[in-house]
């Protein structure tokens, strides 16, 4: 939004409050919906509950660098092979790729919304090394974390954010 000079303090305060409110609304929406993008696949109630449980377990363990498909299957209560088969059937994604996808989407969210350096984000989402995180991020988003941050840091366009996190 552009303003003509001289600018009234009330107009400036109003514009800032509106921009902050819009940013908070988008932030809250995408915090809740960050791991969506698999929901458009038709699932019965039991499958939906399983998918919700799997995603919740992954999010709970997102900072754990040792979290693996074996640990996920143990927490879900089914064999690794059966969990792999179910997730492929329900969401068309393997458990390891689902874990990586959720971690990388959370990393993207942190890079856009927090003033946190890239190494810190890598550890917050469960990557043990900065280089592995950067390579995985580049493979997933098609750009480095630094390029991503530069491009989307002040983005408030809902459609663009939906493409990133959807």
Short names for language-model regions:
Residues 7-16:
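C-terminal output helix
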């Amino acid at each position: 939004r552009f303003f003509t000079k001289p600018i009234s303090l009330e107009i400036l305060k109003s514009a800032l409050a509106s921009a902050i409110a819009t940013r908070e609304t988008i932030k809250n929406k995408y915090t809740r919906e960050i791991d969506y993008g698999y929901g458009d696949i038709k699932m019965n109630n039991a499958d939906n509950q399983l998918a919700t449980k799997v995603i919740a377990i992954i999010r709970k363990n997102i900072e754990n660098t040792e979290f693996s498909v074996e640990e996920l299957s143990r927490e879900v209560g089914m064999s690794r092979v059966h969990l792999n088969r179910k997730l492929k059937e329900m969401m068309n994604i393997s458990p390891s790729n689902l874990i990586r996808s959720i971690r990388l989407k959370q990393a993207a969210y942190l890079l856009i919304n927090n003033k946190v350096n890239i190494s810190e984000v890598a550890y917050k989402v469960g990557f043990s090394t900065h280089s592995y995180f950067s390579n995985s991020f580049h493979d997933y988003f098609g750009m480095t974390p630094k390029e991503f941050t530069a491009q989307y840091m002040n983005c408030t366009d809902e459609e663009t954010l939906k493409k990133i996190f959807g």
